[in-house]
Amino acid sequence: MTGGRRVEISSQKCLFDDFFKIDEVIVSHQQYDGRMSTDARRLVFERGDVIAVLLFDSEARSVVLVEQFKLPSLIGRRRDDPATMNGWITELVAGMIDAGETAEEAVIRDTLEETGYLIRNPRLIGKFFSSPGGSSERVFLYFARVTVVQKVEKGVGEDIKVLHISVDGLFDRLAQGVIDDSKLAIAAYWLQNNIGRL
């Protein structure tokens, strides 16, 4: 929703190019009063698009989540909260969208790799930027049903613990404010608002 406002990029160069990229951008934009802002230097963490999927077992009235070690969750934790300083995080199945792959294909691939469930027809809940002040990462959030018969393999992609959490347990975590993954929190709110229609 830019409303036709102008943006001018004077320069853009890559400062770091590895698994992720960091670009330096000199940019100005049209302000709300109609004038152009002065040039500003911005750094953009180029992460690419990612998927996340809420796996729902309606028969067991539970969700399938994963727990794994994520270094940034350890480094970024506040030092005054030692109880949460272990680096393991409970989250949705999630991953990067590979080159030449659709978001839906990535959902199916990552779900099989991380949990062993072979899903079909994932439904897009929405898409959003995870941290638009500094990152280009866009999340495609999906919903998919799972049943015991869809568990076709162990799931061997990474060092991951697969968790089956009751829907009530998920909603309790949401109410207590102990979900520390934004994708999971958004999905839990979505499920809370839509469970009667599923």
Task: Enumerate the predicted regions with their spans.
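Short loop segments at secondary-structure junctions
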Residues: Q30-Y32, D57-E59, F69, A144-V149, ...
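N-terminal presequences and immediately downstream first alpha-helices
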Residues: M1-V27
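A short coil-to-beta-strand element that immediately follows conserved catalytic motifs
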Residues: E8, L118-I125
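Active-site-adjacent beta-strand/loop module that shapes the phosphate/pyrophosphate-binding cleft
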Residues: D18-F19, V27-Q31, S131-K151, L163
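Conserved Nudix-box catalytic region and its N-terminal flanking loop in Nudix hydrolases
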Residues: R42-F45, E59-R109
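Acidic, metal-coordinating catalytic segment for phosphate/diphosphate chemistry
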Residues: D17-A60, Q68, R78
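Nudix hydrolase/Nudix homology domain
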Residues: M1-S11, E67, D81-P82, N86-W88, ...
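Short, solvent-exposed loop/turn elements at beta->coil junctions and helix N-caps
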Residues: Q12-L15, G126-S131
